[in-house]
Amino acid sequence: AADRNAKVFLMFNNPTEVLREHIDRSRKAIDDPRVTVLDLYCGPMAIAGSTRMQATTSELLVAGAALEIILNRVLQPILSKEQLTSLDFREINYTKAFEKMLNGLTGEANTKTLADYIKFERDIYRENGLITYFADELLMDILTDTTERSPTFMLSPYKQYDDTVSPPSWSFVKHPLRPTPETWEYMLGRAPRCLNWDSDLYRKLGADAIASAPPRVNKNELHKFLIGNEEDPSRTSREPNVAVAIKSGRETGKSNFNAFMEAFRQNAKAFQKQHTFIIGNSNKSADYRIDYDLPSSPLNLMERLMVKLTLNTISTGTMVLMGRVTSNWMSWVNISNKKLRDRGIRLISEICGLSYKDACYALHETLEEFEKLSEADKKSISPVNYTIQKNQGNH
């Protein structure tokens, strides 16, 4: 981008000097005079082990605010005041708006709602049950949170409809009104950009290790994740199973709200239970609600931040009650790539009081031990948490 004379901004949540010292590609970008660095390092986290909470929240706030400000500046010379007002352009102090939103979310009534809902999900999962969310405009927010749960807490990932071997994911999201191909495009705001790469192309790229059996990541494979209104027997294959409609307060005032709820009720007939959850002020009834008067804006930034924080809090709080957090560390991490393996080693080092080197050896001893386990056991036991349990108190 810099070589094409674009203005380049690099945003991250680590101390700049740590990145410069240890990661070559980061140092090159940080030291490039054409790059504007935005270091959003927020210090130690109350609950650590994933970037899904404080780090991405601060990035969403800063990047979202920048986009809304830019949109305002670009459109002001073009649109009338009435048109700008209709698009919810206004002067916003994003720092104060975010602080006010946090205070609203952590108020007594909303905290109780979060606690009650977390206990509800915990009870479902303790009985080996499944939760399927139904959403419209919040589909992306929910899909992001639910898919992140898999590597963060070593849960079963989303599975395709023709996969008869893998267990269903604990949670899933669907749109009650649209079929799957349309839902993917609606959620992304464009057609999905999938890869139709064959073995020859992987060899050309020097990836000989996977060329013999290249990953299938084309559009047909994507559409096998049934996030639309098609019936998916896997979502009711275990009991208890629950359907949960999640809407923002703003959505409940739209003309299509009744159609959504009717479609949700029709889809939910296949489930044992159904619940509704509204985030934001609304005059509609719901089983669970987070009450707060969210300021509107072109991208509805504060609403999306509140939805994100609500979902993050629910999923993380549920995993705490499920025993997948040690102290304040998300210790049931999956080590499916090098980044997560490094994270696991650092978790073991911190919690067990081992050096990084000894923690690395301890984790790999566990992985060697796990070779004797069945595939089902490998998927259900976190090697990081197992290593922590084995080494706690020994040092």
What are these regions (language model features)?
Residues 1-395:
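Conserved N-terminal alpha-helical segment that immediately precedes and caps sugar-phosphate-binding
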